[in-house]
């Protein structure tokens, strides 16, 4: 990179875990070009805003962030707008703000070094979508934590009427088996004890193994489970229609596959699910949930919910509350419907009054919060293996993850990357506390 004035970069990622993964890869890419990460945007020569376009509020937040990058003397760093806002708005970004120098989509960020060079002569836009060449061009992972993300699939073919993902991430594409397995080995060699497989519809992954046999995500997970040193496997985000019997059975057969599943449903009303083009019913979703509980009785379940979708009645909303009550979630995410330009739902009649949506969101979130607290309380007394991931606020405090994705607070002389056996002793709304069983059971990576 022949730009000595650009020595330090800062990346801020918004939104989903896929964006977090992309942010990590962009950081590694820029470091491979000789740049160093800055602690804050104020000291960076290049700022990359890795954006989310799922909701209007998330997209607008980015433009506010751009404005804050102007420095007291009137100058600003080189600014690259990456991610899904960049993909959705393209050159319109440059018309909306003069501060952005580079617009780069989520399938083109491997071109970032070249785009930085071009930006010296003028503003540039790259929103091409050649998915696999992106992974080919990225450098090897350098540093990873105890838990690492690994993208195996991108894009979406479902075209839910409220969602921009098919337009910003493109069609469903699965990375080849061999490259996934190779990257997983590399992550473990660098210290990862847990890998989370990522995809917009991760359970839609398909490919051929080394013997040329067709495989689904369950086959890939079975292969990864054989890697020595890899202790835990997770995957997210899934679609109910791609939840195969083989994948369900994997939850009961593979010890390394953690007893946690995030499976969005969005609504408990069949009428609203049809309007959303979800292509499943509340009943079929509940059947999946019950089957998962059969094969893995201790599984913790998570979901996503949208309230205030166009035409949603109080009866429709009550159906969602009823579904939540029947499933019993350990964790879930709820959102008020946000019209996204270019999606069919944005042009539907019977848009819901925002005040009604907010009131429903409060009621729904109260139920979800109670369920999360109840789940945490139900785990008190359980023995659990906890993966230590970071330091806590106190000097002797460490925080790790339980198999059920709970944050576990531990006070003991352990290190990041340790897998420790504890008894869960106390529960709060968002975390639990753990007591060591025996220090001899510590296992340091």
Swiss-Prot record:
Radical SAM core domain: residues covered:
142-374
For [4Fe-4S] cluster 1, which residues are the binding ones? 16, 52, 84
Q: How is the cofactor bound?
A: Binds 2 [4Fe-4S] clusters. One cluster is coordinated with 3 cysteines and an exchangeable S-adenosyl-L-methionine.
Q: Which PROSITE patterns match?
A: MTTASE_N (PS51449), MTTASE_RADICAL (PS01278), RADICAL_SAM (PS51918), TRAM (PS50926)
Q: Which UniProt keywords apply?
A: 4Fe-4S, Cytoplasm, Iron, Iron-sulfur, Metal-binding, S-adenosyl-L-methionine, Transferase, tRNA processing
* Reactions catalysed, as given in the entry: N(6)-dimethylallyladenosine(37) in tRNA + (sulfur carrier)-SH + AH2 + 2 S-adenosyl-L-methionine = 2-methylsulfanyl-N(6)-dimethylallyladenosine(37) in tRNA + (sulfur carrier)-H + 5'-deoxyadenosine + L-methionine + A + S-adenosyl-L-homocysteine + 2 H(+)
Domain of life of the organism in this record? Bacteria
**Xref: SMART domains:** Elp3
| GO molecular function terms noted in the UniProt entry | 4 iron, 4 sulfur cluster binding; metal ion binding; N6-isopentenyladenosine methylthiotransferase activity
Q: What is its EC number?
A: 2.8.4.3
Cofactor annotation: [4Fe-4S] cluster
Task: Indicate the family of this protein.
Answer: Belongs to the methylthiotransferase family. MiaB subfamily.
UniProt-listed NCBIfam families = miaB-methiolase, MiaB/RimO family radical SAM methylthiotransferase
- Protein name as it appears in the record: tRNA-2-methylthio-N(6)-dimethylallyladenosine synthase
Source organism phylogeny: Bacteria, Pseudomonadati, Pseudomonadota, Alphaproteobacteria, Sphingomonadales
- Recorded name of the encoding gene: miaB
């Amino acid at each position: 990179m022949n730009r000595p004035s650009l020595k330090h970069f800062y990346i801020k990622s918004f939104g989903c875990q896929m964006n977090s993964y992309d942010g990590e890869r962009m950081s590694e890419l820029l470091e491979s070009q000789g740049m160093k990460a800055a602690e804050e945007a104020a000291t960076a020569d290049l700022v990359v805003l890795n954006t989310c376009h799922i909701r209007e509020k998330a997209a607008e937040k980015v433009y506010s962030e751009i404005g804050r990058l102007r420095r007291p003397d009137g100058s600003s760093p080189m600014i690259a707008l990456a991610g899904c806002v960049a993909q959705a708005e393209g050159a319109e970004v440059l018309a909306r703000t003069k501060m952005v120098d580079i617009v780069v989509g989520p399938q083109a960020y491997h071109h970032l070094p070249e785009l930085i060079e071009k930006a010296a002569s003028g503003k540039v836009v790259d929103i091409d979508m050649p998915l696999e060449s992106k992974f080919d061009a990225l450098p090897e992972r350098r540093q990873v934590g105890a838990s690492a993300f690994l993208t195996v699939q991108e894009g979406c073919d479902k075209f839910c009427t409220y969602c921009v993902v098919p337009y910003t991430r493109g069609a469903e594409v699965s990375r080849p088996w061999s490259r996934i397995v190779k990257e997983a080995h590399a992550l473990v060699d660098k210290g990862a004890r847990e890998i989370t497989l990522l995809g917009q519809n991760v359970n839609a992954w398909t490919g051929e193994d080394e013997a040329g046999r067709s495989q689904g995500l369950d086959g890939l997970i079975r292969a990864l489970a054989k890697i020595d040193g890899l202790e835990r496997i997770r995957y997210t985000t899934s679609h109910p229609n791609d939840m195969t019997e083989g994948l369900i059975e994997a939850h009961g057969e593979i010890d390394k596959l953690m007893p946690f599943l995030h499976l969005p449903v969005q609504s408990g009303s069949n009428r609203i699910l049809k309007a959303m083009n979800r292509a499943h019913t509340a009943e079929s979703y509940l059947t999946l949930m019950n089957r998962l509980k059969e094969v893995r009785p201790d599984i913790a379940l998570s979901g996503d919910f949208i309230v205030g979708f166009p035409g949603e009645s109080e009866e429709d909303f009550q159906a969602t509350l009823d579904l939540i009550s029947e499933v019993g979630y350990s964790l879930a995410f709820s959102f008020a419907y946000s019209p996204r330009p270019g999606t069919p739902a944005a042009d539907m009649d019977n848009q819901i009054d925002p005040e009604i949506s907010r009131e429903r969101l409060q009621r729904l979130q109260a139920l979800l919060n109670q369920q999360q607290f109840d789940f945490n309380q139900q785990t008190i007394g359980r023995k659990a293996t906890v993966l230590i991931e970071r330091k806590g606020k106190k000097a002797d405090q460490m925080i790790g993850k339980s198999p059920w994705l709970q944050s576990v607070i531990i006070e003991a002389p352990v290190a990041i990357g340790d897998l420790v056996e504890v008894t869960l002793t106390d529960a709060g709304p968002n975390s639990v506390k753990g007591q060591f069983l025996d220090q001899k059971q510590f296992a340091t990576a």
